[in-house]
Amino acid sequence: MALKVLVGQKLMNEVVKYKPPPPKKQGVTSAAGAGGMEWRVLVVDKLGMRMVSACTKMHEISAEGITLVEDINKKREPLPTMDAIYLITPSDESVRGLIRDFENPARPMYRYAHVFFTEVCPEELFNDLCKSCAAGKIKTLKEINIAFLPYECQVFSLDSPDTFQCLYSPAFASIRSKHIERIAEQIATLCATLGEYPNVRYRSDWDRNIDLAASVQQKLDAYKADDATMGEGPEKARSQLLILDRGFDCVSPLLHELTLQAMAYDLLPIVNDVYRYTPGPNQPDKEVLLDENDDLWVELRHEHIAVVSTQVTQNLKKFTDSKRMGSADKSSMRDLSQMIKKMPQYQKELSKYSTHLHLAEDCMKSYQNYVDKLCRVEQDLAMGTDAEGEKIKDHMRNIVPILLDANVSNYDKVRIIALYVMIKNGISEENLTKLFTHAQLSPKDQDMVRNLSCLGINVIADSRKKQYSVPRKERTTESTYQMSRWTPVIKDIMEDCIEDKLDLRHFPFLEGRAQNTNYHAPTSARYGHWHKDKGQAQVKNVPRLIVFIVGGVSMSEMRCAYEVTNAVRNWEVLVGSSHILSPEIFLSDLGSLSKED
């Protein structure tokens, strides 16, 4: 069952459809709609809003009596005859907002409050709430234990980009423990939602991973104490949660990727998953949400750009043939506006094909303008060999012309320098300064490279031993695209973890839990299904590998979760992080790291 569907069902059943008992006081009026349904307001904070937007549809929540969705941090009109459902994180800001709504007893914002915290409320905040004037208005107070954002069916985010600063910047050392507690609770709610009690392991080459792993284990134990069935069932004893720091692979977030999703988010101005394009001459701009409600996007997002346009065109031809719209030649396929005018009843489907043709074309335009020459150099740097497999002796010959090229952006120059520094395991200060001078980088741009040291990367060569790196698998074949030879390290890690080949010295299990990764119980087709309601999410009878990266997951790494799941079939791989990365976001995160205590 897809993560989004699972969370959507839980939000609908436990929050939106929640029906409080009627008020006992006489003379209290309520806002009743047609058919006697009582209208309510849904009040959310940032995470609550993103969860609702990602996992539910407005018409679904309206059908359950939600007339309005409001932001707790914005000014709102009082609706004192209506009850409000609050879906908020138990944070200082959100709890203060809740208290503020009822601080004036003569003019409360709403009639009563039904509060659903995303996770466990800290005792101090809970006490503040109990002592406040809002306490008498709170008729429901529950924890739903969903403190994460299902980004895709196998990808999750904690919606916490500040994790990068908190865990990698020396300036944030004083609040680090508190932040680790917070994200550990969020990760534990993911496991609880999935019904998993996984064996926890971590990359030992970064000190803070064990702190996070131990904190997650503590939270998992608390959930297990509340629900003994968590983690039970055939194969579930083999499920694992693997915690990685971002330093395990800083190459993948920096490379120009040529699969559709990664390429589009790197090269095009996609904001909040919204792609904007102009359908044709004298036509207004169109905005399209790239998400899993679009089956064509799901089909194409992990495909190499070389085949995307062809695939869209083939799909379109199949569609037009099936609807007997006549055979379309290639030119009219590209100008779908005429088809839409002729067949308005198929506007939705034809618009979808139009969107993806434009998306692929926009990506190819950027690629052909300048990205193609960057890709070859980046791939050679990452692999250490050229397209023929020959070891490259002098990378500088390829790098310097790009650094001197005024048409190449500073961001792209930083990417090239960072890749070079990493494959050399650090270079001299003198050589680094020369590269910066060639590229004419500002001090802020230079910080993006220098701050890789905060992630454990050797930037300036010294006597330090090179960090352990996972042994790479040979994957290049004749069918491999020359500009896409690199495979993210996480794919090797996922495969080795499932095959029980991951080095235990560098990826140990947390002590105190009996690992049973080789447990192969006979699988019952009925288990976890026969006793469930039809409306509930079905439980998969396979172990899960949940990979969490501290400090961002790239689009290419997200793709690996699907590839490994499809290849092994008897495991499901999920990957997630504090936030979702594009190369620009990763560089921006690096640039903002402060080294001051």
From Swiss-Prot:
SUPFAM superfamilies, alphabetized: Sec1/munc18-like (SM) proteins (SSF56815)
UniProt-annotated location(s): Cytoplasm, Cytosol; Membrane
GO molecular function: SNARE binding; syntaxin binding
The UniProt record lists the keyword Protein transport: yes
Single GO biological process annotation from the record: liquid clearance, open tracheal system
Topology with respect to the bilayer: Peripheral membrane protein
GO cellular component terms attached to this protein's record: cytoplasm; cytosol; extrinsic component of cytoplasmic side of plasma membrane; membrane; plasma membrane; secretory granule; terminal bouton
Classification via InterPro entries: Sec-1-like_dom1 (IPR043154), Sec-1-like_dom3a (IPR043127), Sec1-like (IPR001619), Sec1-like_dom2 (IPR027482), Sec1-like_sf (IPR036045)
Keyword Endoplasmic reticulum: no
Any Pfam family the entry gives: Sec1
Record keywords, A-Z: Cytoplasm, Membrane, Protein transport, Transport
Role, per record: May be a component of one of the vesicle trafficking pathways. May interact functionally with Ras2 protein.
Family of the protein in this entry: Belongs to the STXBP/unc-18/SEC1 family.
Record protein name field: Protein ROP
Provenance organism: Drosophila melanogaster (Fruit fly)
Organismal lineage: Eukaryota, Metazoa, Ecdysozoa, Arthropoda, Hexapoda
